[in-house]
C-alpha cells in the first residue's frame, strides 16, 4: 500500500514532495450543442463574464482551478448544481444543464466523444493548469522517477486545443488522427 509517485495538478503545498513540472494543460469551454456560443470556434476569456459555469463539488482541484478562471473572467458558478466527476460535468453539459470548463486531455481521444457538446477554445492566453509529477524528496527512487517524469512530458501538439476539436467545435475523431499518423503526418489542426 505505498505510493512512490503521482501525477497531479499544481499547486501542491507540501515541502516534503519534489515536484517536476510536466506540461501546461489548456482548458476548453464545453457548451450544449444548441447554446448561443455553440457556433463559436474561439472566444476571449472576458466573454465568459455573463456565464454561470457548472463546477465540480468541493475537494476537487479542478473546482479550485475553474473558480480561479471564473474570477478572472467575471463569471460565476451555477448555483444548485455540483458534479462529482468530469464525466458527470460532461453529461450535464450534454443534457443542456449549463456550460463548463474541461481540461484538454479530458476531451481528446480515446475519451468518448459526444455530439451533444461543442468545445470552444480560448483566444490569446488560454486559461490552463500546470501538471507535475511528484514524489517524496527522500525517495531512494528519485533518480529513476526524474527520468520517468521526463517520459511523461507531453509534446505541445498533443495539448494543442486546436487538435482537441474539429473546426465546428465537435471533438476531433480518433479516425482522423489515426489516418494522419498512419501516413506519417501530424493530425490536422484547425
Would you name each region that the model predicts?
Residues 1, 48, 66, 91-97, ...:
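Hydrophobic residues within well-ordered alpha-helices
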Residues 1-31, 68, 94, 116-120:
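Short beta-strand-centered segments that line the small-molecule binding cleft or hinge
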Residues 9, 52-73, 141-150, 155-166:
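Secondary-structure junction motif
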Residues 10-11, 33, 103-106, 131:
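Short secondary-structure boundary segments
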Residues 14-27, 31-53, 145:
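Flexible hinge/capping segments at coil-to-helix
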Residues 33, 39, 117-161:
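A late-sequence structural motif
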Residues 72-80:
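A local structural motif
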Residues 82-89:
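Short helix-initiation/N-cap motifs at beta->coil->alpha
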